[in-house]
Amino acid sequence: MSNAEATTSSDRTGTGKAEAESVHNPEAERVRALLEPSVQAHRLYLEDVSIHVAGANRVVHVVVDLPQEETGGVSLDVIAEISKELSGILDGDPSYDSRPYDLEVSSPGVGRPLTEPRHWHRARGRMVKVNVIQGENLTGRIQSVDDDGVTLVPEIAAKKGMKPKQGEPEKIPFDRIRNGKVEIEFSHLDEVGLEDENNGPSEEA
């Protein structure tokens, strides 16, 4: 049986078990295949599944996100609902032995690095820092995202006490982007998962 915990957080370890040993990747892939249909039925994207072992304890950590065409965050109510459903699926999995496990279901927090095209789609309209390969790093607001890259409206630093100016939109191809990170803005703190850069609200199911 499981102890299921629903969280919205960018902290991928969740319980602080930093010394837990990650289970061999094929097992995580098997669990992913087992859980993915249920996640998709909730119109969500299964971002990641990881399994960690610390002594006799196991932690199954599932990260779900909205589809890339949507903005905002996954609500805590949805996280709690799908957590209970996934717990039932794992409890009925004949491949799992009788050892107890903790199931943690979360959505990515604002601190998630932007490393894949879908991450950039999800961050449309947000202020981001872009780590550029062989070029000067940029800060600006994402105007649009397509198959080739990201169009950014750069933020130009101004004198102290003055608002930054906006530059002309600039297209950055994905092959020039190492990664990026969303900048926290006070106007977005009411969105799910943005209360804190590393830990959002949590609920134990």
Curated annotation (Swiss-Prot):
Residues 1-27 are annotated as: Disordered. GO terms for biological process: ribosomal small subunit assembly; translation. It is found in: Cytoplasm. Residues 1-13 have a biased composition (Polar residues). Pfam families: DUF150_C, RimP_N. GO terms for cellular component: cytosol. Disulfide bonds: none annotated. InterPro entries: Ribosome_maturation_RimP, RimP_C, RimP_C_sf, RimP_N, RimP_N_sf. It comes from the Bacteria. Keywords: Cytoplasm, Ribosome biogenesis. Residues 18-27 have a biased composition (Basic and acidic residues). Coiled coil: none annotated. Its main location: cytoplasm. Required for maturation of 30S ribosomal subunits. Belongs to the RimP family. This is Ribosome maturation factor RimP. The lineage of its organism: Bacteria, Bacillati, Actinomycetota, Actinomycetes, Micrococcales. The gene is rimP.
